[in-house]
C-alpha cells in the first residue's frame, strides 16, 4: 500500500544536500591547498593566529588558495548550467501529465551518482578536474532545484485549499530547519571523525534509501494519461511543454500577467542572491581573518539552517496580523541587514552574531511560491513550477559562478565586498514587490485572477 507523505523524501534529500555542500566545499579547498604549495593543512579554531600572520607568506598563500577555489567552483557550476536548465524544465513541465515522481527519481539518481563519484575521488585521490565531468553528467538527470520543484507541485496537487497548503509548507519548513540545522552542526564532526570518504558514503546510502521510498512507497497524485503518451511523439511532447508554458503567461488579464511576471522576477532575484552567497560564506570563513576549522564551519552552517525553523515561526506568527506581501518584505529587509553586517565582520563572535538577522531568510521564498501558486489554475501548477525551477536553476548556476568570480577578484583588497553587493542587489526584489503592491495585490484577489482565465491552456 502506497502513502501520500512527501515529507520523508524531502527530509532525506535535505540531509544529503546539507551534508554534501559543506563537504564538497572543504574537500575542494583542501585539495587545492595541498596542490598549490608545501604548507600542511592544519585545522585552527583560533582566529587570532590567523590575524597575526597577515604579513607572512602563509597569508598570501591563503589568498591564492581562496582565488583558486573560487575559480574552480566557477568551472564546476558552469559545467552544470546547460544540462541542468534543459533537464529541469523538461522534467517538471512534463510532470503535469506523467506524474511528479519522475523528476524526483531522476534528480535523486543524479545526486547519487555525483556523491558516489566524490566518494571514489576522495578514496583514490583522483584528479580534481574529474569533478567537473561528474557534475555535468549528474545535471543531465536534474538537480536539487528539480527535486524541490516536483515536491512543491506534489503538495499543491494534494492541498487544494490555500490555508491547508500554506500550513503544510510552513510545517515542512520547520522540519527542514531541524534536519538541516542538525546536519550542518554535525558536518564538521563527520569530516573530523569519519573523513571525506565515509561521509560521502553515508550520503550516498541516504540517497539510496530516499530512492527506495519514492519508487516503492510514495503515491503519485497525478495519474498518467496512457492515451496521450501513446499518441504524442518526443518532438510533439516537447512542443507541448513550451506551449503550456507560453499559455501560462498569455492567458488571463493583463493584471494577472503583470503579477505573474513581477512575482517570478522577485523570487528569482532573491533566489539569485541567497544561493550565490551561500558558498561564499564557507570560503570567507575558511580564509583570513577567521580561518575556521571544519567544526566551526559546521556551527556556522547550523546557524544558517536555523532560518528554516525561524522562518516557519515567522510565517505562523506574522500571518495572523500581516499580509503575504508584508511578510516577504520583512524577510528581504532583515536579510539585507545581515549582508551589510557580514561585510564588516572580522571576528568569530561577530560572525556568529551576524547570523541573527538571517533568521527570516527563507520566508520570502516560501511566501512568494505560495503567492504564485494562487495566480494560476491547478492544471498549470506543473508548468508554473517548471518555469520557476528553470529560472532558479539558471539563477543558481549563474549566481554561484558570478559570485565565485567576483569573490576571487575582490578577496585580495576587500573580502567583504561581495556581501555589500548582495545587500545592494536585494533592493531589486524590494522594488518589485512595491510594484506588485501598486498594481493592486490584495489577499483574496488571487481567486478572481484564476477564475478570469479561460480553459484554453489545457492540452487536447
From Swiss-Prot:
Reaction equation(s) it catalyzes: estrone 3-sulfate(out) + n H(+)(out) = estrone 3-sulfate(in) + n H(+)(in); 25-hydroxyvitamin D3 sulfate(out) + n H(+)(out) = 25-hydroxyvitamin D3 sulfate(in) + n H(+)(in); cholate(out) + n H(+)(out) = cholate(in) + n H(+)(in); glycocholate(out) + n H(+)(out) = glycocholate(in) + n H(+)(in)
Gene Ontology BP term (one): vacuolar transmembrane transport
GO molecular function: copper ion transmembrane transporter activity; symporter activity
Parts of the chain on the Extracellular side: 26-73, 133-135, 192-195, 279-301, 346-347, 403-410
Signal peptide as annotated in the record: 1-25
Induction field: In liver, expression is induced by the environmental contaminant 2,3,7,8-tetrachlorodibenzo-p-dioxin (TCDD); the induction is mediated by AHR.
Protein known as: Lysosomal proton-coupled steroid conjugate and bile acid symporter SLC46A3
Natural source organism: Mus musculus
Amino acid at each position: 500500500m502506497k502513502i501520500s507523505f512527501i515529507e520523508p523524501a524531502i527530509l532525506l534529500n535535505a540531509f544529503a544536500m546539507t551534508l554534501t555542500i559543506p563537504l564538497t566545499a572543504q574537500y575542494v579547498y583542501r585539495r587545492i591547498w595541498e596542490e598549490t604549495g608545501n604548507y600542511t593543512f592544519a585545522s585552527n579554531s583560533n582566529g587570532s593566529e590567523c590575524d597575526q600572520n597577515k604579513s607572512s607568506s602563509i597569508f598570501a598563500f591563503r589568498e591564492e588558495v581562496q582565488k583558486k577555489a573560487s575559480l574552480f567552483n566557477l568551472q564546476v557550476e558552469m559545467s552544470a548550467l546547460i544540462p541542468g536548465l534543459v533537464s529541469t524544465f523538461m522534467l517538471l513541465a512534463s510532470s503535469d501529465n506523467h506524474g511528479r515522481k519522475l523528476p524526483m527519481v531522476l534528480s535523486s539518481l543524479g545526486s547519487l551518482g555525483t556523491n558516489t563519484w566524490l566518494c571514489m575521488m576522495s578514496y583514490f585521490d583522483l584528479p580534481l578536474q574529474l569533478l567537473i565531468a561528474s557534475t555535468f553528467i549528474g545535471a543531465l538527470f536534474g538537480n536539487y532545484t528539480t527535486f524541490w520543484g516536483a515536491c512543491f507541485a506534489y503538495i499543491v496537487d494534494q492541498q487544494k485549499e490555500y490555508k491547508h497548503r500554506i500550513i503544510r509548507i510552513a510545517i515542512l519548513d520547520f522540519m527542514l530547519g531541524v534536519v538541516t540545522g542538525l546536519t550542518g552542526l554535525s558536518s564538521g564532526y563527520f569530516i573530523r571523525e569519519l573523513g571525506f570518504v565515509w561521509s560521502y558514503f553515508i550520503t550516498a546510502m541516504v540517497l539510496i534509501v530516499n530512492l527506495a521510498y519514492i519508487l516503492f512507497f510514495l503515491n503519485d497524485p497525478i495519474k498518467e494519461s496512457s492515451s496521450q503518451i501513446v499518441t504524442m511523439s518526443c518532438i510533439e511532447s516537447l512542443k507541448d511543454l513550451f506551449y503550456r508554458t507560453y499559455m501560462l503567461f498569455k492567458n488571463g488579464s493583463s493584471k494577472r500577467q503583470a503579477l505573474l511576471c513581477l512575482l517570478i522576477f522577485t523570487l528569482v532575484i532573491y533566489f539569485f542572491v541567497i544561493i550565490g552567497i551561500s558558498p561564499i560564506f564557507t570560503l570567507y570563513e575558511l580564509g583570513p581573518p577567521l580561518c575556521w576549522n571544519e567544526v566551526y564551519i559546521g556551527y556556522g552552517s547550523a546557524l544558517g539552517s536555523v532560518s528554516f525553523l525561524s522562518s516557519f515561526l515567522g510565517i505562523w506568527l506574522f500571518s495572523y496580523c500581516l499580509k503575504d506581501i508584508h511578510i516577504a518584505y520583512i524577510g528581504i529587509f532583515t536579510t539585507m541587514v545581515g549582508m551589510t553586517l557580514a561585510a564588516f565582520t572580522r571576528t568569530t563572535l561577530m560572525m556568529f552574531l551576524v547570523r541573527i538577522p538571517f533568521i527570516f531568510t527563507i520566508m520570502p521564498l516560501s511566501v512568494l511560491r505560495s503567492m504564485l501558486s494562487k495566480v494560476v489554475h491547478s492544471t498549470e501548477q506543473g508548468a508554473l513550477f517548471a518555469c520557476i525551477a528553470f529560472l532558479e536553476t539558471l539563477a543558481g548556476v549563474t549566481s554561484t559562478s558570478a559570485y565565485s568570480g567576483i569573490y576571487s577578484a575582490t578577496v585580495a583588497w576587500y573580502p567583504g565586498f561581495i556581501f555589500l553587493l548582495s545587500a545592494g542587489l536585494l533592493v531589486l526584489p524590494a522594488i518589485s514587490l512595491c510594484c506588485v503592491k501598486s498594481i493592486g495585490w490584495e489577499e483574496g484577489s488571487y481567486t478572481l485572477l484564476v477564475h478570469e482565465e479561460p480553459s484554453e491552456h489545457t492540452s487536447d
